[in-house]
């Protein structure tokens, strides 16, 4: 078992934290806004650890669902499950175990948060299979990656206000943007095996679609900042995030694989500076 531990870590992408960070930033945004900038440390710990665990569970489920496809894609052919180093039942057992630990984390929280967690698990578990049916499965991914937003509001306020759903919508647009750039890396392989992705659906309009999704996401955050009367630290963070999106355009415009992958990874900075703006606004109490 100990000898297989490194394989399990690779299965759940512990060597690639970018996915966890892309989940974490929107969740932290929601925690800070829901609590007026003063979230309980215990809540921050619960949601941060829960984000890591559920992302890891999602990776295991994704590799199980895609095991017959991944062997035909150069980038994924050597994943532990695809290459036969881990059995299918092991991936399922790991995913279930991580999901159960995540649920144990939220046991001290209110009933609404627990109810929403059931929806979150369902969305996370079904996302990998959406790539067979939906033309833009990245939108479904945005819901899965952003469900920490309504859960955070539920945990703090015991309700999910409209602003939480607006933030979830923004996360859907953001996910379509960064995951389309990611899908551009594998587009040729995905076309051969019949996988459906937004990069394939958008076709020659892929770069335009990505930039429009960035614009929609940033536009929602303009509305959010105005509605909550945020001060200059927030807008500085927003401007930095907008700058990141422009930088991403310079990376993806020629559709070069490694540059598209770099744009995907750089979204960590976009999410980070936006959260920094929110946190700084509350920390400095600027109105």
Swiss-Prot record:
A molecular function GO annotation: 4-hydroxybenzoate polyprenyltransferase activity
One cellular component term from this protein's GO annotations in UniProt: plasma membrane
- The EC number(s) given in the record are 2.5.1.39
Compartment annotation: Cell inner membrane
PROSITE patterns the record matches: UBIA (PS00943)
Task: Say yes or no: keyword Signal present.
Answer: no
Task: Give the record's pathway.
Answer: Cofactor biosynthesis; ubiquinone biosynthesis
Q: Does the keyword Transmembrane helix apply?
A: yes
* Keywords, comma-separated and alphabetical: Cell inner membrane, Cell membrane, Magnesium, Membrane, Transferase, Transmembrane, Transmembrane helix, Ubiquinone biosynthesis
Please report the record's description of how this protein sits within the membrane: Multi-pass membrane protein
- Main localization is membrane
Q: What does this protein do?
A: Catalyzes the prenylation of para-hydroxybenzoate (PHB) with an all-trans polyprenyl group. Mediates the second step in the final reaction sequence of ubiquinone-8 (UQ-8) biosynthesis, which is the condensation of the polyisoprenoid side chain with PHB, generating the first membrane-bound Q intermediate 3-octaprenyl-4-hydroxybenzoate.
Spell out the protein name for this chain. 4-hydroxybenzoate octaprenyltransferase
Could you tell me which InterPro entries the record lists for this protein? Answer: HB_polyprenyltransferase-like, Prenyltransferase, UbiA_prenyltransferase, UbiA_prenylTrfase_CS, UbiA_sf
Which cofactor(s) are needed, names only?
Answer: Mg(2+)
UniProt organism field: Burkholderia pseudomallei (strain 668)
Q: What biological processes does GO assign it?
A: ubiquinone biosynthetic process
Q: Which Pfam families match?
A: UbiA
Family according to the record: Belongs to the UbiA prenyltransferase family.
Catalytic activity field: all-trans-octaprenyl diphosphate + 4-hydroxybenzoate = 4-hydroxy-3-(all-trans-octaprenyl)benzoate + diphosphate
Residue ranges crossing the lipid bilayer per the database entry: 30-50, 92-112, 133-153, 158-178, 207-227, 232-252, 266-286
